[in-house]
Structure formats: structure tokens, C-alpha cells
Amino acid sequence: MLTKRIIPCLDVTDGRVKKGVNFVNLVDVGDPVAIARRYQEQGADELVFLDITATNQGRQATVDMVAAVSRQVFMPLTVGGGIRSVEDMRALLLAGADKVSLNSSAVADPDLISAGARLFGNQCFVTAIDVKTDPATGQKMVYTHGGTKPTGLEALAWAKQVVSLGSGELLVTSMDKDGTQDGYDTAFYKELTAAVDVPVIASGGAGKIDDFADVFLNSGVTGALAASVFHFQQLTIAQVKEDLIKKGVPVRWNQTLQRGS
């Protein structure tokens, strides 16, 4: 089994980290730079920075904020939100992002995936996919614009398409699970990871320490993203990693990791 990654996520709007349930009812969590520094100290493997209102407001993720965060952390930083061109990608990479993430713009212009992968390499290109269950059919469907717009795209088919276009990684969020803290949609991630040959990050639903081992041991995901459980300090990253090691899940470990907040 490959080494698994624990990845906190900063959902940022108006320069502040926010968190809600099912993509709504956002509450203020704090300053992005301070929170990023805390996760650096706790031993996060990567950090995801998503400007969650950039697309709806017709703007790019704040480059200055990305630069400020990148100066504080020494782990891979993935940035998404409002990216519409290769110039936007270049600006974020120059500001300190290690990877860029497309979501709504990838659906609007799939060729943007190929263009970004050709210019910057598929290793630094992530496609984020927000997935919600259709109550009528039970199918997993793709939504964009912060989960507000249905696309009519079936999730597995879209995942296969973006990989074929050059995406080097998938960040897949279960909208049904987002912020609920009742566990990842492990069955879906098992199906998804069997269908694609790139790393997949699971997102949405982490609430208790067992949830991380469950998704790693019962699906092929290589990373588990979480927000609420870390932001509100119900668990630390070090506590999660200690539990994973006990359960036979390989993770990066450093004896100096902070167990507290």
C-alpha cells in the first residue's frame, strides 16, 4: 500500500476561512495564514486552498493570499477557484502554488485541462469534482459553481474524461457528505478509484478518527481531505496519523509532530 496523505482544506471567501454543511450555512473559522501554519506544525502532508466564491463572483483566487500562505508552509499547496485560463494558472504557480485545481471552468471548457497539462505538466494539474446523488436515479452527478449548478454529467464518466485530457489527480467531494461528519462515501470512492488510474483525494464527511482508516482500507484513494474536524480541533492531524499507523495504513510520520492545537 502506498503512503497515504492527510490533507486539510481551507475554503476561503473574503479573505477568511469558512466552513458550512452541504456547501451552505458558512461560518467563519479564521485567518488562512494562521490556520495554514498550524497545519504545517501538525504534520499535514498537503494543503488545499479553495476560493469558494471566486467562480460565482467572476474573479480568480486571490494571488496575494496564496503567496502569503505559501510563505508559511513547506508542503505541497493546491489552489483552486476562478481559474479560467493558462495565464491564471501561471500566476498562481508563480505565487507559490505547487498544483492548480480546476472545477467549474473544466466543465465549461474541457480543453483547458489539456492546455494546462501540456504547459505545466499533469503532475501539477488537479481536477476537482463536486458530486451529488440524484434522488430519482441514485446516480452520482457533477455540480459546479460551488455546488449550485447541475451539469447533467455523470461523475464516473466525467472523471474518466478529465483523466484522458491530462488531469494528473482528482479531488472528489461528496456534496451529500460535506460538513456532515458522518464518514466518507467509501463505496463511491471504491468504484471511482477502480475506474481511473490517477491519484484520487476523498473529500466530504470526515468526523471521527475511524473515518480516515475506513476510506483508506476500503477504497483506493491516496489522500483524505478534511476541514471541519481539523478546523474546530476535534482531531489533530497527528492523532489521525497515529491511529492510521496502528491500523496498518502507511503515512508519513515525524516524532516532532504536534498532537495538540
Swiss-Prot record:
<dbReference type="GO" id="GO:0005737">
    <property type="term" value="C:cytoplasm"/>
</dbReference>
<dbReference type="GO" id="GO:0016829">
    <property type="term" value="F:lyase activity"/>
</dbReference>
<dbReference type="GO" id="GO:0000107">
    <property type="term" value="F:imidazoleglycerol-phosphate synthase activity"/>
</dbReference>
<dbReference type="GO" id="GO:0000105">
    <property type="term" value="P:L-histidine biosynthetic process"/>
</dbReference>
<comment type="pathway">
    <text>Amino-acid biosynthesis; L-histidine biosynthesis; L-histidine from 5-phospho-alpha-D-ribose 1-diphosphate: step 5/9.</text>
</comment>
<dbReference type="Pfam" id="PF00977">
    <property type="entry name" value="His_biosynth"/>
</dbReference>
<dbReference type="InterPro" id="IPR006062">
    <property type="entry name" value="His_biosynth"/>
</dbReference>
<keyword id="KW-0963">Cytoplasm</keyword>
<feature type="active site">
    <location>
        <position position="130"/>
    </location>
</feature>
<keyword id="KW-0368">Histidine biosynthesis</keyword>
<keyword id="KW-0456">Lyase</keyword>
<comment type="similarity">
    <text>Belongs to the HisA/HisF family.</text>
</comment>
<protein>
    <recommendedName>
        <fullName>Imidazole glycerol phosphate synthase subunit HisF</fullName>
        <ecNumber>4.3.2.10</ecNumber>
    </recommendedName>
</protein>
<comment type="subunit">
    <text>Heterodimer of HisH and HisF.</text>
</comment>
<dbReference type="InterPro" id="IPR011060">
    <property type="entry name" value="RibuloseP-bd_barrel"/>
</dbReference>
<comment type="function">
    <text>IGPS catalyzes the conversion of PRFAR and glutamine to IGP, AICAR and glutamate. The HisF subunit catalyzes the cyclization activity that produces IGP and AICAR from PRFAR using the ammonia provided by the HisH subunit.</text>
</comment>
<dbReference type="InterPro" id="IPR004651">
    <property type="entry name" value="HisF"/>
</dbReference>
<dbReference type="InterPro" id="IPR050064">
    <property type="entry name" value="IGPS_HisA/HisF"/>
</dbReference>
<keyword id="KW-0028">Amino-acid biosynthesis</keyword>
<dbReference type="InterPro" id="IPR013785">
    <property type="entry name" value="Aldolase_TIM"/>
</dbReference>
<feature type="active site">
    <location>
        <position position="11"/>
    </location>
</feature>
